[in-house]
């Protein structure tokens, strides 16, 4: 039987796309390498996702938001950009929610909660039949022609569909198998992520702190359920070789180290989760489409996390592609026509290019330690604090309403 659509990857992007297509009449199958248990009940991975107001609206439409649970959604009211260490002349720029039409700039939700909600929304009760989800499957080959796309699985089975969509991460093997090149930038840094409690309140404010030799981020979470103390997701970015010693430290030593790195500004910080590390690599696929093929989410554009736009941009790609597919199907047109795929590519690349380039520029500038770079970034923060129209533009970008 020929399928309408095969989505490779049942992470948040693939599952959200499958959910967006429910009730459209399209026959959709998801292929995932992980086990069904890992997809249904994803493990905590340390990552908190900053969601714009626009992304929250899309997630409500897809039925994900109501499945997250109120206690798993933390409001992000303000953002604070810092440059320079404690005890030095530290530059600050505050982006207030008062610069936006909403009572908060956005929201913070743990990645594993988003993954769980996406599975429940895609596979649970809802409009139209659920897609087919096949776990423990690996794609070993892909061929396309004017009529169909054919995927070969590790088991030797061949599947045929009118369109294949890659949603299998920024290191997408499906994209690579289609011969699509990608510009990849290794920033030479790894981020360590974990949850920590602290006695001083975070005031629902996210920090992005560009200190000398390190970058720190603080993402405000809801209070710790065990102690009631303020709790934050902590992100420490260092050169690759400097992360492992922090992962190997016992909890007491790690708490001391992180309290010191934050200059004691939050009081004594205490670990409240496992620690995780992720190398930072930016990816820009040179093409998002090919014959009977499209890429979404990180498989299309993999962002550096410094501007917190990765998942939000991925949701935008899903919204753009799903609407085009549904419209074509309802009009009796080919869902993988070259014209449709080219329009999707142009629309999403236009939406992503400026953000990707700006994010890359910021990430590059703030990893350089020579004196001119320090002067430049300090000057940018100080100028931004004085220039309200710039802060208003940043607030619009953070909310996704700009």
Residue ranges of each PLM-predicted region?
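Central beta-strand plus flanking loop segment that forms part of the substrate or channel wall
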Residues: 57, 171-207, 214-216, 238-242, ...
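C-terminal helical "tail/cap" subdomain of flavin- and related membrane-associated enzymes
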Residues: 323-402
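Conserved FAD/dinucleotide-binding core of flavoprotein oxidoreductases
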Residues: 211-278
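N-terminal FAD cofactor-binding segment of flavoenzymes
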Residues: 43-84
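Conserved N-terminal helical subregion
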Residues: 71-177, 185-190
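Glycine-rich FAD pyrophosphate-binding loop
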Residues: 22-47
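Short FAD-binding loop at a beta-strand-to-alpha-helix junction that anchors the flavin cofactor
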Residues: 286-305
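N-terminal Rossmann-like FAD-binding beta1-loop-alpha1 element of flavoenzymes
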Residues: 3-30
